[in-house]
Amino acid sequence: MINYRHLFFVVFLFFYGCVETLISVTIIPDGRYHVKIESQGDERDIKDKDFNLPSSSNWSVEEFQKQDIDSDETIFVRSAESLLSGRNFLGDNGQLGSLRYPISVEKKKGIFSDTYTLIQIFEGRNIDKKYPMLSKSLLNPGNNKLENRVQTEIIMYCLRRSMKDVSTDQNVEALLQERILNHFNGVFFKAEEENKLFEILNEGDEEKVEFLNLPEKLVRTNFKPFVDLLPRNFIDNCINRMRDYLHEANVTIQLNDDTFKFVGTLPGVVFSSNADSISSDSLWWIFDLKDFMNESFTIEAASVVYYPQKIQQTIVLGALVILIVLFFIAKRKAKS
């Protein structure tokens, strides 16, 4: 019999949705910069909140639909734009695991020129460290042996981190934490051997399969042997904290099929950048989750605006000073 839950999870993991996000940044001479972020794709995929567009009062937000010319499918579009200055912490909504992409633009005034520096960072997800099986699966889709263990790995990571966080306040010894983790590992190992792993993780929920859910009943059941050894409310606090870490994992998985394009326009002459390509006066970067799976992905560019008139004035002034000095030297020599 086909395990449809397993099949859906695998399909979701590797083919779920497709959202393309274009980030356009134009720096104006006074050092401020116009930012427009536009995501387009399936409406559900855009609203899954793996990539958060700014929505504060200083941003103009728009949502609309359009028809794809080739496929005649409906494309959902959400955009946000604003005029900013300095550094802005985009994507930081205060929720653990949200993709943050801070941006900074700096203008340095000089005597003969002004320099502009643009930096935007897509913070790394640290997948290799957090979920090594998921990392391998994303890089090698179709490996069933790895795919079968991804969900267990993520749940165990969430449990481990939540127990560590809660134990800091409730003083649960590290040895007891390890005993609990070993117990859960044993439960998952046995379920995998009996081909019941996805059943116990999904707890009979046929509908809610779009993302990883917390198997709360399973967690509470397997905490029972340790209830008398744990502080009051420890289990409840752990479960609440697990939801935060599970959100982080869901964001990472949902980012798997997202693509990003960044176009930057700077005043003057660009003298440094790590752009993928240059078109007219614009710098282009194209990237996806693989570029920030572990380490952060950084967009960097710098330009300079020279002021020829100031340079000419300085040269003329310098020449006049030299001539005056030479004149007085010559005059003094003539007198002597």
Residue ranges and their predicted role:
Residues 62-320, 328:
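Mature, soluble, non-transmembrane domains
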Residues 1, 55, 280-281:
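Acidic, low-complexity intrinsically disordered regions
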Residues 19-76:
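Start-of-domain marker
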Residues 1-22, 323-336:
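Bacterial Sec-dependent N-terminal signal peptides
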Residues 3, 15, 32, 305-306:
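Intrinsically disordered, low-complexity N-terminal regions enriched in serine/proline/glycine
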Residues 13-18, 51-58, 260, 264-266:
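Short, solvent-exposed secondary-structure boundary motifs
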